[in-house]
Regions:
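Short polybasic amphipathic segments
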Residues: 307-313
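Oxyanion/phosphate-interacting regions
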Residues: 2-107, 115, 275-295, 314-325, ...
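DPxDG-like acidic metal-binding loop motif
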Residues: 207-211, 222-296, 303
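Residue-level signal for inorganic ion chemistry
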Residues: 106, 110, 138, 149, ...
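N-terminal capping segment at the start of a domain
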Residues: 104, 108-132
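Multi-pass membrane proteins that catalyze or facilitate reactions on polyprenyl-/lipid-phosphate substrates
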Residues: 169-193, 310, 324-326, 336-340, ...
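N-terminal assembly/interaction segments in proteins that build large macromolecular machines
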Residues: 123-225
Length: 467
């Protein structure tokens, strides 16, 4: 129903992502002494794109959903079941700003290490207890991000749960490795002013670096605030010169409130996501970035309840990060027809059953070949509208870790998509290190229609699968 009202508005300049916006709080008086408080934001281009509305009327708990593409008329639907964000506008802005800068720095660090890994041999690889490769980049990113968050937000205010521990690195026979990590961290932190952050007064010593890594010892859980960090997600992709991600999320009282995903090798053209990394490197070399363009790499970020997700290019060469660094909004794809949809899954069939997803793809009418990509770059692909579906069905008994999903999930949700387990329930980030209670697998989709088709297909085929 169209809304006719006389209103009283206060305008506040506001920035979340790339475009300058004006945030307006409007009080709309209605009959019976009640009033609405409307929070809306208007872009420079005059499009109103997000609004929240609360009705303050005695004996009423109704909530409403507004949608509008221009600032003059609203379409209002009753949506009693819809949960609106209760976040104040601007909440977590400082944390988001710092997190994006920290992830930009982490991407810069990773790019340097990956380049040297590819040009050298595998001498910089070290086997973890589970035999997965871990590199200098994992520890260096963890130390760098931990140090930045502690310095800027105060170490007493910062709790971090992260993938790496210091055991291997602290061993007597790891002195060379530790030295390389300390050097990498200091080289990166020396560049902090380029990213709008303060560099340490003097270089960090090995004990400070070990301290920064081991400070990431939060166990997560349902209460309070903690960061979840995957310093290099998709380590296998990283060591192969392929896709990987740096993932940082802020979780408060069990809910993800901020997500920042750095994808240093995300190609400018989505078709290149499916190219073998060697081709991509050749193409990158043939088309060097000009001062106006960037050939790969982005940081995507969002804040819970904002209804928007943003993408910044990585800063190139010796340039400075000027906030928000040419950020552009990202939105999920509008494709609903399975025949036109692209689905992503892990490269490694050990991480997700390719045969089960092939069966699902067939039964819902997906026609394209799966897009197999390492790491949380798959979440980025959905949020950017470059693919429509991400499915992961790990073997029975495997427990998904929160840092492998938190940032990607919130980014897809705020970009307009849907992410649940295969039973249609939200992923639960409140149970510590693992996504406890996850039903069968993870399904992320650009839209609810595709999502429903896939969850139904899972139900229909699960019992006859070997999973
Ligand atoms: N057996 C297994 N089943 C499912 N996921 C696994 C797995 N072993 C490792 N993983 C997770 O899958 C992530 C890689 O994702 P993908 O397969 O999509 O590239 C790994 O992140 P790390 O590389 O950070 O350890 C790890 O957390
Ligand atoms: Mg990971």
């Amino acid at each position: 129903m169209p809304l006719n009202c006389s209103s009283l508005a206060t305008k506040v300049p506001h920035t979340l992502g790339g475009l300058k916006t004006t945030a307006t709080t409007t009080t709309i008086h209605v009959g019976g002494g009640g009033f609405f408080n409307l929070f809306s934001k208007t872009h420079q281009n005059n499009s109103l794109y997000i609004a929240s509305l609360s009705l303050n009327k005695r004996n009423s708990s109704q909530r409403y959903c507004l949608s509008s593409s221009s600032s003059s008329s609203f379409v209002m639907e009753d949506t009693k079941d819809m949960v609106f964000s209760t976040l104040e506008p601007g909440k977590y802005s400082k944390e988001l700003d710092i997190a994006v800068r920290a992830v930009q720095m982490a991407c810069f660090l990773c790019q340097k290490v990956q380049e040297s890994l590819i040009s050298k041999t595998t001498s910089q690889l070290q086997a973890k207890d589970d035999n997965s490769p871990v590199t200098i980049a994992d520890w260096s990113v963890q130390a760098t991000v931990s140090w930045i968050l502690s310095e800027t937000l105060g170490s007493r205010n910062v709790a971090i749960i992260a993938e790496e521990d210091v055991q291997t690195l602290s061993k007597a026979d790891s002195a060379g490795l530790l030295e390389a990590v300390v050097q990498t961290v200091n080289d990166c932190l020396a560049e902090a002013p380029r990213f709008g952050l303060k560099a340490p007064g003097t270089s960090l010593g090995s004990s400070e670096v070990l301290e920064a890594i081991s400070r990431c010892n939060s166990t997560g859980g349902p209460n309070g605030r903690f960061w979840a960090l995957d310093p290099v997600d998709g380590t296998l992709g990283f060591v192969r010169g392929d896709q990987y991600a740096v993932a940082l999320a802020l979780i408060e009282d069990g809910e993800v409130v901020l997500g920042v995903l750095g994808c240093p090798n995300y190609p400018m053209r989505k078709e290149w996501l499916s190219y073998h990394h060697r081709y991509h490197r050749i193409i990158s070399k043939l088309t060097p970035p000009t001062s106006e363009s960037w050939d790969k790499g982005c940081v995507i970020y969002t804040r819970r309840g904002s209804g928007e997700a943003w993408m910044q290019p990585l800063i190139q060469g010796h340039k400075k990060l000027v906030w928000p660094n040419s950020a552009t909004p990202v939105k999920v794809s509008t494709i609903e027809n399975p025949a036109l949809a692209t689905f992503c899954e892990p490269v490694e069939k050990a991480n997700s059953s390719h045969s089960f997803t092939a069966g699902l793809a067939h039964s819902v009418g997906l026609r394209k070949q799966p897009l197999r990509v390492y790491s949380m770059v798959k979440y980025a692909a959905i949020a950017r509208g470059d693919a429509e579906i991400f499915m992961k069905f790990a073997r029975a008994g495997y427990k998904e870790k929160i840092w492998d999903h938190a940032a990607g999930v919130i980014i897809i949700q705020e970009a307009g998509g849907v992410v649940t387990d295969a039973g249609g329930r939200p992923l639960d980030f409140s149970k510590g290190m693992y996504l406890e209670g996850l039903d069968r697998g993870i399904i992320a989709c650009a839209g609810a229609k595709l999502h429903e088709k896939i969850t139904r297909a899972v139900d229909a085929s699960w019992n006859s699968s070997s999973l």
